[in-house]
Amino acid sequence: MPSATPFRLDPDHLRFMTDGVSINTASSGAQDLPSQCRAFGCRVDDAGRRIRVFLSGAQAADLLRDVGQSRALAVVFSDPPTHRTIQIKGRDARVERLAPGDPAVVAAYRTAFVACLRPLGFTEPMVRALLDCPDADLVAVGFTPEAAFNQTPGAQAGTPLQAGAK
């Protein structure tokens, strides 16, 4: 039976997810074959009740097909300097139209990710090439978070994050 209280991430996790960390998405299709694609930013709506990630339609073709079939999506947010990582899962994912401010969110994400990786020796042109996608190719995938996990390497990896708690 579904919970009467929707799952909510705490404000620290919401800030972390939108702060220039590495974002990767995954799904699976009819035969449970996985698909994966790097995301180009994240928007958190309605105090974390809805999450939108931005992908290249061309690069994410398999993942978008799988989301259309299964509606399942897992998103991993990882800070490269510290390896702090969280995973968010949802079962109602769908491709959505970009909102007017979404390209600006993607542009800000690219700049923040450059700043995150520069101290590790990655050049701005390299990071921008990694995140290259014309605005016309951007798509959004929105979902409701149902579960979240600590995926930081170590003894606590895989443990559930408590809804609404740090």
Model-found features: residue ranges?
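Short, structured beta-strand-loop surface elements
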Residues: Q59-Y109
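C-terminal edge-of-domain segments
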Residues: P2, Q87, A93-K166
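Short beta-strand segments
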Residues: T18-S56, I86-Q87
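Short, structured patches in soluble enzyme cores that scaffold and shape functional sites
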Residues: S27, L55, F77-D79, T144-A147
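Beta-strand secondary-structure signal
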Residues: R52-F54, A74, K89, A140-G142
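Short, surface-exposed beta-edge/turn micro-motifs
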Residues: G20-I23, S70-L73, L138
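A generic local secondary-structure boundary/capping motif
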Residues: H13-L14, L64, R128-C133
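Short, basic/aromatic recognition patches
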Residues: M1-I23
